[in-house]
Amino acid sequence: MSENELAKIVVSIAYNIHSRLGPGLFESVYETIMEHELIIKYHLHVTRQYPIPVIWKETKMELGFRADLIVENKLIIELKSIESLAPVHYKQVLTYLKLSGVKLGIIINFN
């Protein structure tokens, strides 16, 4: 399955979650349900709170970067439940993409 096909599935799930639960819940609620739907309904490999290290001159450095969800090692999903996205949120996903080698990332704000 391509990155774009995975992204369409994720957006559809996010829409359904938001339609049923609405805004205002903690991010972890949306994350848990998203993971559940991807695994149970679509039988996809999902890693939750995936650590993303920095590799510098063959030294692995753990800086605390964690992607909310990685699907099939092809798509990073960063979920938010905040008033509005700030530039730092886009930078966060770009950092994760560059460090992980994953090609596509999505930010979804449930608020």
Please place each PLM-identified region on the residue numbering.
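Interdomain/boundary linker segments immediately adjacent to catalytic/signaling cores
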Residues: 1-21
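Nucleic-acid nuclease catalytic cores
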Residues: 80-111
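Nucleic-acid endonuclease domains
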Residues: 2, 25, 59-60, 93, ...
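Active-site catalytic microenvironments for nucleophilic, acid-base chemistry
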Residues: 17, 37-40, 99
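Active-site metal-binding core of divalent-cation-utilizing nuclease and nuclease-like domains
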Residues: 23-74, 82
